[in-house]
A protein has these predicted regions:
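A non-catalytic alpha/beta surface segment that caps or lines the substrate-entry region
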Residues: 1-33
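Active-site metal-coordination/substrate-binding segment of hydrolases
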Residues: 29-100, 105, 110-111, 120
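Functionally critical mobile loop/hinge segments
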Residues: 117
């Protein structure tokens, strides 16, 4: 919510912790159809049976394999972070003409998007 507050955007957060941030269209695009950017914020941390990391407090052990970054013994955990980062970057930009934007950040994607339905936007 701090991001939305800091940028003066209207936002809603539902009881399931889904968030929608609204950014008005720029001049000339006010009457264009709204564009929704959606990403999920949650992740499921998975580790190999012999991995001793505590996924609640330890960092990941990363390794580079050619052009790939991999986590050793665990899921990488980035999951849909790129969608969240992309949406925040677009919202923060003040030099990109755009229609009204609704950035929808959901939780519970791994269980059939059941928790994302709480936004009232889906």
């Amino acid at each position: 919510m701090e991001f939305a507050k800091d940028h003066g955007f209207r936002y809603v957060q539902d009881e399931l912790n889904n968030v929608v941030i609204y950014k008005p269209g720029t001049p000339g695009y006010e009457n264009s159809p709204t564009v929704i950017i959606q990403g999920h914020m949650d992740m499921v941390a998975v580790k190999d049976a012999d991995c001793t990391l505590d996924l609640e407090k330890d960092g990941l052990l990363l390794e580079i394999d050619g052009d790939w970054v991999q986590a050793k013994g665990t899921s990488l955990g980035a999951d849909d972070g790129i969608a969240v980062a992309y949406a925040l970057a677009i919202l923060a930009a003040d030099d990109i003409p755009h229609p009204a934007l609704e950035a929808v950040f959901t939780v519970g994607e791994e269980v059939g998007l059941t928790r994302g339905n709480g936004t009232g936007c889906l």
